[in-house]
From Swiss-Prot:
GO terms for biological process: translational elongation. GTP hydrolase that promotes the GTP-dependent binding of aminoacyl-tRNA to the A-site of ribosomes during protein biosynthesis. The gene is tuf. One of its GO terms (molecular function) is translation elongation factor activity. HAMAP family: EF_Tu_B. Mg(2+) binds at T26. It comes from Bacteroides thetaiotaomicron (strain ATCC 29148 / DSM 2079 / JCM 5827 / CCUG 10774 / NCTC 10582 / VPI-5482 / E50). It is found in: Cytoplasm. PROSITE patterns: G_TR_1, G_TR_2. Residues 174-176 are annotated as: G5. Belongs to the TRAFAC class translation factor GTPase superfamily. Classic translation factor GTPase family. EF-Tu/EF-1A subfamily. The lineage of its organism: Bacteria, Pseudomonadati, Bacteroidota, Bacteroidia, Bacteroidales. This is Elongation factor Tu.
Length: 394
């Protein structure tokens, strides 16, 4: 029998489970797949298969992450779960696993704990738009008032970090109960998935955003002009479109006279395509790796920004010693690298390997930047940190 073709009929959303250690994130992930598997919407994944998360490398950092996929009646989900707290911090800050929304798991027996708070803060910093709360272990709490108290604390915590605490759905359940097939708790998992379907917004598709392509390589074709190659990050480009060439201090406009992919001529290229764009009236030495091509007026070069970063531990191949204010490493942004000076938050003397911190960066020249852009920090040929831009200063 022929293999079934993957039909992308439902919109795709990336989510994950976050929250304090031992509050039941992985158990809940297993419970979701188990309950949905009974309805034919998922492959059953055991706790052990999820907990035994494979190592992945992202921008030179090793992260343990489990990827699970399942469907609801309306959507297709890719769900990430991490075994350790440090893995979450790395995952969220480096964007190894982009989240369009998250389920924050909080044990009703404990209430919000330090990592509950830290994960909500991280979700805010890296612009996860909305969270859904799953109060776990409710089968172990007899006192209705206790549940109300924990729910109130969670709403206050969400509001404190600028989430919509008043309207965020909070589901009271038991992940273990659902995993063991107790109907009451299975229903709560379905209720949770309904909340996720309705509360977490569909992400804008990259194709619908304005055109942007970081330049990876440049060459000239005799008699035809200059070609810039790269992977289109967002948007669509048509033959005849005007583009802006930004970065490295030089800005210029041009018109795309040809779009090539795998040596074939196309009418257009779209987000995700690796293409070569033929540019009118551009000399080969006016454009180089690290610049970006974009729709005119969409993005400006900047040199100062705020960012949330994770600094690698010695064991991860990072620095052996802390760094101080005015540290000047290399920043790798898209396809370019540029020296930048780090300013630490007031009251922070130094940053230790293994820390995550909010920093201000001043690059030595302006480059095309936007909030949410991921980057690596390197020094002497090795990655010492990774992060993402949270705010452009100028």
């Amino acid at each position: 029998m022929a293999k079934e073709k993957f039909e992308r009929t439902k919109p795709h959303v990336n989510i994950g489970t976050i929250g304090h250690v031992d509050h039941g994130k992985t158990t809940l992930t297993a419970a979701i797949t188990t309950v949905l598997a009974k309805k034919g919407l998922s492959e059953l994944r055991s706790f052990d298969s999820i907990d035994n998360a494979p190592e992945e490398k992202e921008r030179g950092i090793t992260i343990n992450t489990s990827h699970v996929e399942y469907e609801t009646a309306n959507r297709h989900y890719a769900h990430v779960d991490c075994p350790g707290h440090a893995d979450y911090v790395k995952n969220m800050v480096t964007g190894a696993a982009q989240m369009d929304g998250a389920i924050i798991v909080c044990a009703a027996t404990d209430g919000p704990m330090p990592q509950t708070r830290e994960h909500i803060l991280l979700a805010r910093q890296v612009n996860v738009p909305r969270l859904v709360v799953f109060l776990n272990k409710c089968d172990m709490v007899d006192d209705e008032e206790m549940l109300e108290l924990v729910e109130m604390e969670m709403r206050e915590l969400l509001s404190f970090y600028d989430f919509d605490g008043d309207n965020t759905p909070i589901i009271q359940g038991s992940a273990l109960g659902a995993l063991n097939g107790v109907e009451k708790w299975e229903d709560k998992v379905m209720e949770l998935m309904d909340a996720v379907d309705n509360w977490i917004p569909l992400p804008p598709r990259d194709v619908d955003k304005p055109f942007l392509m970081p330049v990876e390589d440049v060459f000239s074709i005799t008699g035809r002009g200059t070609v810039a190659t790269g992977r289109i990050e967002s948007g669509i480009i048509h033959v005849g479109d005007e583009v802006e060439i930004l970065g490295l201090g030089e800005d210029k406009k041009s018109v795309v006279t040809g779009v090539e992919m795998f040596r074939k001529l196309l009418d257009q290229g779209e987000a995700g395509d690796n293409v070569g764009l033929l540019l009118r009236g551009v000399d080969k030495n006016e454009i180089k790796r690290g610049m970006v091509l974009c729709k005119p007026g969409q993005i400006k070069p900047h040199s100062r920004f705020k960012a949330e970063v994770y600094i690698l531990k010695k064991e991860e191949g990072g620095r052996h010693t802390p760094f101080h204010n005015k540290y000047r490493p290399q920043f790798y942004l898209r396809t370019m690298d540029c020296t930048g000076e780090i300013t630490l938050p007031e009251g922070t003397e130094m940053v230790m390997p293994g820390d995550n911190v909010t920093i201000t960066v001043e690059l030595i020249y302006p480059v095309a930047l936007n909030p949410g852009l991921r980057f690596a920090i390197r020094e002497g040929g090795r990655t010492v940190g990774a992060g993402q831009i949270t705010e452009i200063i100028d």
